Design a protein with these regions (language model features):
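Ordered, helix-dominated protein-protein interaction surfaces in large eukaryotic regulatory proteins
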Residues: 25, 45, 49, 58, ...
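Aromatic-rich carbohydrate-recognition surfaces in CAZymes
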Residues: 65-79, 117-120
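Eukaryote-skewed repeat-based solenoidal scaffolds used as protein-protein interaction platforms
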Residues: 81-202, 208
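Solvent-exposed loop and edge beta-strand segments that line ligand/cofactor-binding
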Residues: 5-17, 55-67, 107-117, 155-165, ...
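Positions within ordered alpha-helical repeat solenoids
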Residues: 29-32, 49, 61-62, 78-81, ...
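Internal amphipathic alpha-helical repeat/solenoid segments
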Residues: 1-69, 82-86, 108
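Terminal, non-catalytic domain-edge segments
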Residues: 1-11, 15, 21, 26-29, ...
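Residue-level detector of extended alpha-helical repeat arrays and alpha-solenoid scaffolds
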Residues: 20, 69-72, 120-123, 168-171, ...
Length: 355
């Protein structure tokens, strides 16, 4: 995909940073990225061409938008070089993030765009990685994210709407980054996530009464992992492995030893669904479900979910279905890049002057 795409991909012209991130992160989880400097340079050049109003648009000369800004930032994080980090205009990016903040304390996706917890998470994640989590930017944001929790236990895209796996991840990741998970009912969230794992297939559905979809291996599986990280009421704390960091100035996450995730959901059943049903043989790549075609989005998030399920929490050993060769590196539960890459980016931007 990074060498060139067919004409059919013209429909994704406004998703260029996403394509770069999906492919780069998938390669990184397969430990096939770091040796290819030419791919990294070409990706940086592509992302630079998408810069707009201090942030990133979906393609060259397109409107600045929080979603491709998030994707571009994560792709640059995965690349992890000074050249990649220098592609970010931090003062202009911060001005853009501030301009997207709404009176509700959520964030608009773009100028005059919709306000929801996606915009909120993407803004806060980018701000955390680039060390611009200022009091002005974060004021009231945690309360907005918490207000999206529904009677079901999950989170909707905005207050008062149906709980959904993607929005649930965005909400709980925002709260973890801001250290504000005390504002929500984590037990209800865990129960909702557990109910989204299907009994027969073993994968996750995105909402109640929907079909299984491999991408929710991460959106729901990552939510379960974040919930485990978020439980700070227990006095027994352990350090997160591999330097899992959440924001500048925090050397490692301190998380309690709480109920293992595998007692809430079944990581082995999930991994079997990903490996046996979502994987495309013999050509490679991953898909939503059997009968669907492979694509870069599902390849990225199915692999991310596979990683999250293999590293379920900070106190448990690896949980691997099948051959030990199936084990992937850990992915950061809030940013979905490898933790060492997140630390490298945090260190780089923490060394710059405050804005």
């Amino acid at each position: 995909g990074l060498a060139g795409l067919s004409g059919g991909f013209v429909a994704l012209d406004a998703s260029r940073p996403w394509l770069v991130y999906w492919i780069i992160h998938a390669l990184d989880l397969l430990e096939a990225l770091d040796e290819d400097d030419d791919i990294k340079r070409r990706c940086i050049s592509t992302l630079r061409a998408c810069k707009s109003s201090g942030a990133f648009g979906g393609g060259p000369r397109q409107l600045a938008h929080l979603a491709p800004t998030y994707a571009a930032t994560l792709a640059l994080c995965c690349i992890g070089s000074n050249e990649a980090f220098e592609a970010i205009d931090r003062p202009a990016l911060y001005a853009f993030l501030l301009s997207m903040k709404d009176a509700s304390n959520g964030f608009r996706m773009h100028d005059d765009g919709e306000v929801d917890v996606r915009g909120t998470y993407t803004a806060i994640a980018v701000a955390a990685l680039t060390n611009v989590l200022t009091p002005q930017l974060v004021e009231g944001v945690a309360e907005y994210a918490a207000s999206c929790q529904t009677y079901e236990g999950g989170f909707g895209g905005e207050p008062g709407v149906e709980a959904h796996g993607g929005y649930g991840f965005c909400a709980i990741a925002t709260l973890c980054i801001l250290d504000a998970c005390h504002l929500v009912d984590l037990d209800a969230l865990d129960a909702w996530v557990a109910r989204r794992q299907t009994n027969i297939e073993g994968g996750y559905q995105g909402r109640a009464n929907k079909l299984v979809d491999a991408c929710y291996s991460f959106w729901q599986g990552g939510t379960a992992q974040l919930s485990a990280h978020a439980r700070r009421g227990d006095p027994h704390h352990v350090e997160a492995p591999q330097g899992v960091r959440w924001r500048p100035g925090v050397s490692t996450a301190q998380v309690p030893a709480t109920t293992p995730i595998q007692e809430i959901v079944d990581p082995i059943k999930l991994q079997r669904y990903i490996l046996l049903c979502a994987q495309v043989f013999p050509d490679g790549g991953l898909r939503d479900k059997p009968g669907k075609g492979r694509d870069y989005y599902h390849t990225c998030y199915a692999l991310s979910g596979l990683s999250a399920s293999q590293h379920p929490d900070c106190t448990s050993p690896h949980v691997v279905a099948g051959s030990p060769a199936n084990l992937l590196p850990r992915t950061h539960p809030a940013f979905n890049c490898r933790p060492e890459k997140v630390s490298r980016m945090l260190d780089h931007f923490s060394g710059l002057p405050d804005l």
